[in-house]
């Protein structure tokens, strides 16, 4: 992997021009070879050189080039390798064979011709092939005629040649005297008995394959150099010394000749010489789970993308990308062969793995009636002065109070009773209870609705709200009381009260003995905090004892309609303050007597726990989950939305009909507005409560009975008190419209545009926003800090993070294109710097890189010593490479620049690096330059796997710990990879072993 660019190209061009100027005369050099003005021999080659030429004799000739003489190869001791005759020709030679032989494929050996194979050798009856020749034979009762091919029937009588008993081995001649004389065929000699014939070397080379010598006993066969005589005394056997015996692979000399064998992964062919690769993938896919790739002499299993090969190098296992660091910003869901990133509520996915805050306010003000404030992961609607409070749906504003308070608001009940000398108090919270465990030693509980608070600058002298709700100021007085209590030898832990201790809390009795109907309070905030008593001389309790502090804040209201002629608002206020103080006094006693209860979802909870004080009390197991959580396997998990924690069963229970819970880990559910105990079980937010007006309808409070949105308006949400106008005088085709798309616009806007109701035209979405749908009146702002490359974007996928560059870590880190693994933005420039500690150098692995290859290098990644174009360049590319590469930096520090054009985009890169001790530079260089590191697909996958590359980096950064690492990672790395590293590390660290 690398660039086609040549570092220092400009320098090279300058050198070429300088040399051209210096040798301007040489630049006009004459090519004597082309013009024919050379004096080379006809059997020589002319080679032009600067300002001259040289002559070289052709192959097969010898001399100085100006005089060349043919080399007679046949004069060599081995006859040029020819086993029979060698014929010298100009510049070469050729081998020929005797009659009865033909030249072998190697051009040197001679093999017997089987004359009988073609036309029976011309024999009338039978043909017998012999080395270098053949003979015709006749059946019984016949003898061979003088032409040595036809057969003549023998007569029964007579002493002439026609008689079968004439005794001649070859030819019988009748003499003039009536006798017979025997003769031999050409190449044979008559023996002393004048009847038999003796073979000579003149016939069929004496039956010898190579050389033949005549002796008294007959021909004696011999073999050419590097051949041996067979046990038959005629045939010459090849040896492994000659052309490896003709074997493709291994050759073994045997009594019957050469014996060829093939290595593992190859099969010997029928010619007993050639080896052919076995395609293991043809049988059962080679045993591979996914992909089998045949290689020369072997095969290799590989896995589909998203899977990794196990150490048995056959089976594939899904890669759990979610186990890697930095895979997803929020939630990672592993899937077979892949993964999926999800974002928390209020965030949107971009760049495949990243989450950015959604600016809900950019989408028609988030649906708010008036103001909208974006917050991380959410947003908040606001009501301006004079428009009342925020509606329960969180978007509309209620009408200003008409001096009768807010009877529908959630109330908390604080009730106390006295039985003898014992005071028992209970805090009952029917709705809007919030439980928040702050730590192992504390929690907070809030109940009810706090009174609206004014901004500090506008607070009244008594601290009450002086906001725009003037009627609330006049009609309702908010009274606040705060108290702090201390419980010794107890620890903050909300736990269910034992049945034997339960006593019903009655109503508090006022100073005059009358029932206290004002024990309802609008809001209570309770905080429990446990800490250990510090050691000291003044400590009244033994060191290490638990001390629990309870902090209680109460809010109550006094209403104008409760005034009488004898007691106005100030009088009512004083009464309420006295009653609250009396309640707090009884509350303090009940706390000291361990008789203060928190009543949620029909269950009584104690706030602090004094272990071992009550006989028979069940000890809580140390491993139990805290309230608001349930056990899932070995972990404690918060109760999800739509459920609440039931203290008696210690389980998460779905919210009953008519209630909802949008928070996790709560002890009760909130009542739906106007609840009639109808609705789904397990409702997760107020919008799922029953009886709400559906989209396209509205009502005064958002509940039935509802009215359809008038023509010219629409409402996309449920439970709303109003409908939004189309704007610009536009109308709708029908009542009950649920979207701006139902408005009759003058033009139909396509994705990437929004309809401007002022000028009735389609406007392109500005940069940094997008619109995927038709006929909309808004563009959504890109999530988080992302933006688009151009205006008119149609998808959130076109939103990209442009942040990149910076100073990188001294030991390890990543060089990552902006928005990775999503496509990087156009027209961006990133600069990174790596400056290792002293005596450390940089190793970089490029697993893969994706840059557009058709834009003529508009997008470039370069790594060099510093920003100067003439500094030492380590790496430069403008192309896509999916094959990994590892290399060491050519300089001690690196300046890295990534620059993109305005037109193109691609996936980019995530390039890891590590710094290593320069004492191991030779070893690291040896490893990364070894082609075997990249030859196998499985080795390449190691350089792409985030976990395995980390293990590889550990070896390179600390080679002395190699053997410890291999034991740790041997279950992760292929054996071939470990073998490669082991040989190099061992030879470097233990050179003499």
UniProtKB/Swiss-Prot annotation:
SUPFAM superfamilies: EGF/Laminin (SSF57196), Growth factor receptor domain (SSF57184), Spermadhesin, CUB domain (SSF49854)
Disease: Short stature, facial dysmorphism, and skeletal anomalies with or without cardiac anomalies 2: An autosomal recessive disorder characterized by reduced growth, skeletal abnormalities, a distinctive craniofacial appearance, and dental anomalies. Cardiac anomalies have been reported in some patients.
Compartments reported by the entry: Secreted; Cell surface
InterPro entries: cEGF, CUB_dom, EGF-like_Ca-bd_dom, EGF-like_dom, EGF-type_Asp/Asn_hydroxyl_site, EGF_Ca-bd_CS, EGF_dom, Growth_fac_rcpt_cys_sf
Function in brief: Is a positive regulator of the BMP signaling pathway, required for proper chondrogenesis, osteogenesis and skeletal development. It acts as a coreceptor for BMP ligands, particularly BMP2 and BMP4, facilitating their interactions with BMP type I receptors. It is required for ligand-induced recruitment of BMP receptors to lipid rafts. Binds to TGFBR2 and activates TGFB signaling. In lung cancer cells, could serve as an endogenous autocrine and paracrine ligand of TGFBR2, which could regulate TGFBR2 signaling and hence modulate epithelial-mesenchymal transition and cancer progression.
Keywords: Calcium, Disease variant, Disulfide bond, Dwarfism, EGF-like domain, Glycoprotein, Repeat, Secreted, Signal
Biological process (GO), any one: positive regulation of osteoblast differentiation
Glycosylation sites recorded in the entry for this protein: 417, 464, 685, 756, 785
Post-translational modification, as annotated: N-glycosylated. Proteolytic cleavage produces a CUB-containing C-terminal fragment that retains the ability to bind to TGFBR2. This reaction is catalyzed in vitro by MMP2 and, to a lesser extent, by MMP9.
Cysteine pairings via disulfide bonds: 33-46, 40-55, 57-68, 74-86, 82-95, 97-110, 116-127, 123-136, 161-172, 168-182, 184-197, 201-212, 208-221, 223-236, 240-251, 247-260, 262-275, 281-292, 288-301, 303-316, 322-332, 328-341, 343-355, 361-372, 368-381, 383-397, 804-830, 857-878
Gene Ontology CC: cell surface; extracellular space; plasma membrane
Superkingdom per UniProt: Eukaryota
Signal sequence annotation: 1-20
UniProt-listed PROSITE patterns: ASX_HYDROXYL, CUB, EGF_2, EGF_3, EGF_CA
Subunit and partners: Forms homooligomers. Forms heterooligomers with SCUBE1 and SCUBE2. Interacts with TGFBR2 through the CUB domain; this interaction does not affect TGFB1-binding to TGFBR2. Interacts with BMP2, BMP4 and BMP7; the interaction is mediated by the CUB domain. Interacts with BMPR1A, BMPR1B and BMPR2; the interaction with BMPR1A and BMPR1B is BMP2- and BMP4-dependent.
UniProt tissue specificity: Highly expressed in osteoblasts. In normal lung, mainly expressed in bronchial epithelial cells. Tends to be up-regulated in lung cancer cells.
One protein family per Pfam: CUB
PANTHER family hit by this protein: SIGNAL PEPTIDE, CUB AND EGF-LIKE DOMAIN-CONTAINING, SIGNAL PEPTIDE, CUB AND EGF-LIKE DOMAIN-CONTAINING PROTEIN 3
GO molecular function: BMP binding; BMP receptor binding; calcium ion binding; identical protein binding
Gene for this chain: SCUBE3
Domain CUB residues, every copy: 804-916
Protein's recorded name: Signal peptide, CUB and EGF-like domain-containing protein 3
Span of domain EGF-like: 29-69, 70-111, 112-148, 157-198, 199-237, 238-276, 277-317, 318-356, 357-398
């Amino acid at each position: 992997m690398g660039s086609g660019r040549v570092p220092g190209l400009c320098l090279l061009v300058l050198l070429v021009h300088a040399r051209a100027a210096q040798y301007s005369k040489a630049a006009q050099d004459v090519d004597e070879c082309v013009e024919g003005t050379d004096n080379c021999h006809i059997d020589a080659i002319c080679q032009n050189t600067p300002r001259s030429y040289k002559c070289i004799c052709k192959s097969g000739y010898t001399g100085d080039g100006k005089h060349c003489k043919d080399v007679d190869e046949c004069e060599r001791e081995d006859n040029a390798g020819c086993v029979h005759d060698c014929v010298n020709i100009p510049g070469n030679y050729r081998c020929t064979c005797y009659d009865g032989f033909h030249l072998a494929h190697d051009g040197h050996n001679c093999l017997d011709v089987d004359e009988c194979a073609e036309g029976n050798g011309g024999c009338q009856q039978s043909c017998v092939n012999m080395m270098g020749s053949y003979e015709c034979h006749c059946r019984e009762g016949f003898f061979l005629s003088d032409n040595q091919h036809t057969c003549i029937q023998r007569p029964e009588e007579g002493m002439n040649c026609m008689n079968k008993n004439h005794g001649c081995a070859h030819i019988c001649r009748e003499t003039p005297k009536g006798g017979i004389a025997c003769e031999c065929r050409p190449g044979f000699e008559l023996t002393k008995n004048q009847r038999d014939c003796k073979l000579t070397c003149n016939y069929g080379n004496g039956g010898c394959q190579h050389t033949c010598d005549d002796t008294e006993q007959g021909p004696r066969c011999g073999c050419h150099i590097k051949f041996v005589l067979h046990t038959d005394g005629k045939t010459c056997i090849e040896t492994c010394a000659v052309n490896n015996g003709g074997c493709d692979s291994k050759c073994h000399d045997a009594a019957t000749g050469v014996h060829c064998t093939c290595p593992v992964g190859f099969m010997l062919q029928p010619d007993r010489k050639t080896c052919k690769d076995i395609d293991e993938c043809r049988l059962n896919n080679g045993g591979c789970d996914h992909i089998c790739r045949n290689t020369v002499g072997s095969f290799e299993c590989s896995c589909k993308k998203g899977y990794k090969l196990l150490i048995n190098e056959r089976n594939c296992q899904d890669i759990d990308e979610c186990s890697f660091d930095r895979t997803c910003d929020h939630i990672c869901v592993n899937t077979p062969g892949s993964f999926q990133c999800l974002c928390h509520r209020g965030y949107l996915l971009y760049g495949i793995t990243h989450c950015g805050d959604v600016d809900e306010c950019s989408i028609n003000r988030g649906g708010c009636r008036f103001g909208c404030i974006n917050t991380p992961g959410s947003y908040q609607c606001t009501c301006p002065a004079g428009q009342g409070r925020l509606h329960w749906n969180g978007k509309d504003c209620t009408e200003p109070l008409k001096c009768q308070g807010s009877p529908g608001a959630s109330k908390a009940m604080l009730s106390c009773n006295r039985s003898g000398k014992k005071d028992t108090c209970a805090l009952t919270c029917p709705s809007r209870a919030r439980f928040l465990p702050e730590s192992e030693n504390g929690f907070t509980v809030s109940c009810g609705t706090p009174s609206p608070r004014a901004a500090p600058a506008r607070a009244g002298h008594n601290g009450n709200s002086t906001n725009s709700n003037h009627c609330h100021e006049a009609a309702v007085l908010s009274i606040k009381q705060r108290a702090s209590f201390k419980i010794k030898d107890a620890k903050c832990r909300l736990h269910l009260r034992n049945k034997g201790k339960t006593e019903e809390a009655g109503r508090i009795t006022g100073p005059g003995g009358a029932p206290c109907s004002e024990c309802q309070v609008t809001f209570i905030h309770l905080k429990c905090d446990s800490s250990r008593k510090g050691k000291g001389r003044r400590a009244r309790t033994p060191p290490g004892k638990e001390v629990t502090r309870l902090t209680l804040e109460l809010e109550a209201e006094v209403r104008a309609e409760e005034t009488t002629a004898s007691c106005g608002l100030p009088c009512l206020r004083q009464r309420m303050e006295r009653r609250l103080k009396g309640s707090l006094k009884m509350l303090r006693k009940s706390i000291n007597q361990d008789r203060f209860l928190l009543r949620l979802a029909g269950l009584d909870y104690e706030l602090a726990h004094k272990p071992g004080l009550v006989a028979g009390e069940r000890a809580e197991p140390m491993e139990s989950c805290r309230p608001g959580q349930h056990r899932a396997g070995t972990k404690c998990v918060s109760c999800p939305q739509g459920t609440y924690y039931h203290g008696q069963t210690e389980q998460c229970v779905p919210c009953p009909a008519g209630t909802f819970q949008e928070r996790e880990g709560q002890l009760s559910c909130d009542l739906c507005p106007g609840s009639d105990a109808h609705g789904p079980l397990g409702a997760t937010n107020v919008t799922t409560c029953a009886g709400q007006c559906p989209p396209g309808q509205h009502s005064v409070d958002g509940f039935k009975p509802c009215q359809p949105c008038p023509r010219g308006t629409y409402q996309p949400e449920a439970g709303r008190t109003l409908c939004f106008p189309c704007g610009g005088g536009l109308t709708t085709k029908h009542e009950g419209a649920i979207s701006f798309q139902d408005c009759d616009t003058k033009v139909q806007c396509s994705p990437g545009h929004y309809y401007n109701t002022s000028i009735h035209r389609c406007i392109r979405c500005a940069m940094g926003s997008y619109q995927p749908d038709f006929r909309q009146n808004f563009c959504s702002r890109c999530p988080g800090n992302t933006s688009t490359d151009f205006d008119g974007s149609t998808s959130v996928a076109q939103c990209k993070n442009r942040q990149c560059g910076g100073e990188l870590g001294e030991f390890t880190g990543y060089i990552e294109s902006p928005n990775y693994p999503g496509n990087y933005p156009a027209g961006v420039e990133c600069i990174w710097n790596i400056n290792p500690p002293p005596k450390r150098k940089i190793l970089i692995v490029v697993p893969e890189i994706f840059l557009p290859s058709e834009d003529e290098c508009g997008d470039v990644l370069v790594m060099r010593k510093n920003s100067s174009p003439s500094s030492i360049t380590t790496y430069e590319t403008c192309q896509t490479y999916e094959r990994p590469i590892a290399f060491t930096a050519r300089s001690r520090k690196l300046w890295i620049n990534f620059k993109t054009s305005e037109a193109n985009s691609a996936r980019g890169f995530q390039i890891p690096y590590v710094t290593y001790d320069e004492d191991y530079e030779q070893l690291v260089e040896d490893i990364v330059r070894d082609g075997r590191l990249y030859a196998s697909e499985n080795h390449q996958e190691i350089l792409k796997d985030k976990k395995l590359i980390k293990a590889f980096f550990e070896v390179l950064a600390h080679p002395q710990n190699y053997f410890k690492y291999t034991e740790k990672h041997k279950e992760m790395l292929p054996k071939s990879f470990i073998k490669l590293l082991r040989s190099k590390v061992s030879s470097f660290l233990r050179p003499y072993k």
